[in-house]
Design a protein with these regions (language model features):
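Glycosyltransferase-associated regions of secretory-pathway enzymes
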Residues: 1-33, 49-185
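Small-residue hinge/turn detector
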Residues: 34-46
Length: 185
């Protein structure tokens, strides 16, 4: 499913009306998207993946036994070990609503935060550390085999023909998915 800006507004306005007034004041699209991704996980559950993710293999054998858990991929970046570009959750997990409340509270109180600290990967890492949800962290090679800014990973990625799925699968044989890290926000 692809969510548009209009879908995001409808989600907040209709399903989470207590956040609507604050959401309308947010002036950065990436912040709105980050806020909505956590609320889509709360409302619907399932997998959230950024548009620059490529699914390489069936994830059901891994995720099915973990159905009651939030599942997060790990990344070889000590500053943000848990990115928010790929996440799995059961429907209605209260962790996401708690995280959203934290984010919206900071926005309402005009707490000075970076984009990534409002509802992005820094907020996710803080929320996991603070609220300790029932979750599983996957080895980095399963979902985030490509670490941005790591020379070895960048060299490997530069040799991949990203337009051919079989070439990408060969380049990342032990991975379920990979992101191109387009950083287009």
């Amino acid at each position: 499913m692809f969510w548009t800006d209009e879908d995001n507004e409808r989600l907040i306005r209709d399903e989470y009306p207590s956040f609507w007034g604050t959401f309308q004041k947010v002036d950065k699209g990436v912040v709105k998207s980050d806020l909505c991704r956590i609320l889509y996980l709360h409302k619907y559950g399932g997998i959230y993946a950024d548009m620059d993710f490529i699914c390489l293999r069936d994830m059901a054998p891994l995720l099915s036994p973990l159905g009651g858990h939030i599942v997060l991929g790990t990344h070889n970046n000590p500053r943000q070990p848990l990115p928010n570009a790929w996440m799995y959750s059961p429907k209605g997990d209260q962790f996401w609503l708690t995280m959203a409340h934290d984010s919206f509270r900071d926005l309402q109180n005009n707490v000075e935060r970076s984009i990534e600290q409002i509802a992005g990967p820094d907020r996710l890492n803080w929320a996991v550390e603070t609220h300790r949800p029932n979750h599983t962290e996957l080895a980095h090679n399963l979902v985030y085999p490509r670490a941005w800014g790591v020379e070895e990973c960048d060299k490997h990625a530069s040799r991949v023909d990203w337009g051919k799925i079989e070439a990408v699968k060969r380049a990342y044989p032990n991975s379920l998915a990979v992101t191109t890290w387009s950083h287009n926000w």
